[in-house]
Swiss-Prot record:
Keywords: DNA-binding, Host-virus interaction, Metal-binding, Transcription, Transcription regulation, Transcription termination, Zinc, Zinc-finger. It comes from Bacteriophage PS34. The record marks 134 as: Interaction with host RNA polymerase sigma factor RPOD. Mediates the switch from middle to viral late gene expression by associating with host RNA polymerase (RNAP) so that the latter can read without pausing and through transcription terminators preceding late genes. Competes with host factor sigma 70 for binding to RPOB, the beta-subunit of host RNAP. To join the elongation complex, binds a specific DNA Q-binding element (QBE) and interacts with RNAP that is paused during early elongation. Participates in the lysis-lysogeny decision by activating the expression of the late lytic genes. This is Antitermination protein Q. Interacts with host RPOB (via flap domain); this interaction renders host RNAP resistant to transcription pausing and allows it to read through termination signals. Interacts with host RNA polymerase sigma factor RPOD (via domain-4). Interacts with host NusA (via N-terminus and AR2 domain); this interaction releases the autoinhibition of NusA. The lineage of its organism: Viruses, Duplodnaviria, Heunggongvirae, Uroviricota, Caudoviricetes. One of its GO terms (molecular function) is zinc ion binding. Zn(2+) binds at residues 118, 121, 144, 147.
Length: 207
């Protein structure tokens, strides 16, 4: 069972569910099976499960839990980023909270997010390769160059920058780009890493 099935479980079309064809109905996962598997996955990958469930609007509590997990991670690695490491305690905590909140919002974006769908590929992540289409005489697709194949635009990092400057008024754009934005980007990446870990654990416990 993969994480995507967890989202489907919360709006089921039937009381039984399965990721793949099964020999018999008894091999499918019941609601009790799914809840037990989710509990096991949460105990081993709490960050990833909270991030995913919050992303899919399954729980407002999970959204806040995911941001809290992300803040803990940010505190842990903040010493590597001089623009954050040198900040005073209270200011640093507030900046990390802002970065974690915006990074999680970026992670949550998808082609279904209002206004985020790529205008070039309309959310498919694929675009027509005009040169090869003309060369081969048939439609040839390639990764959409505008969205890099994801089907949607990322949240502009400038939004996080503006929020951080409310706490650090003298933070210039170049300094942000060199010393703070790398941490913001790392937080977004960490969300995806934690989701992948949770997905693998959930798959393992439901085999």
């Amino acid at each position: 069972m993969r994480l995507e099935s967890v989202a489907k479980f919360h709006s089921p079309k039937s009381p039984m569910m399965s990721d793949s064809p099964r020999a018999t109905a008894s091999d499918s996962l019941s609601g009790t099976d799914v809840m037990a598997a989710m509990g096991m996955a949460q105990s081993q990958a709490g960050f990833g499960m909270a991030a995913f469930c919050g992303k899919h609007e399954l729980s407002q509590n999970d959204k806040q839990k995911a941001i809290n997990y992300l803040m803990q991670f940010a505190h842990k690695v903040s010493g590597k980023y001089c623009g954050v490491a040198k900040l005073e305690g209270n200011t640093k905590a507030k900046v990390l909270q802002v970065l974690a909140t915006f990074a999680y919002a970026d992670y949550c974006r998808s082609a279904a997010t209002p206004g985020a769908r790529c205008r070039n590929c309309h959310g498919t992540g694929r675009a027509v390769d005009i040169a090869k289409t003309e060369q081969w005489g048939r439609v040839v697709e390639k990764e959409c160059g505008r969205c890099k194949g994801v089907g949607y635009s990322r949240m502009p990092a400038s939004a996080a920058y503006r929020a951080v400057t409310m706490l650090i008024p003298n933070l210039t754009q170049p300094t942000w780009s060199r010393t703070v934005k790398p941490l913001y980007d790392a937080l977004v990446v960490q969300c995806h890493k934690e989701e992948s870990i949770a997905d693998n654990i959930l798959n393992a416990v439901t085999r």
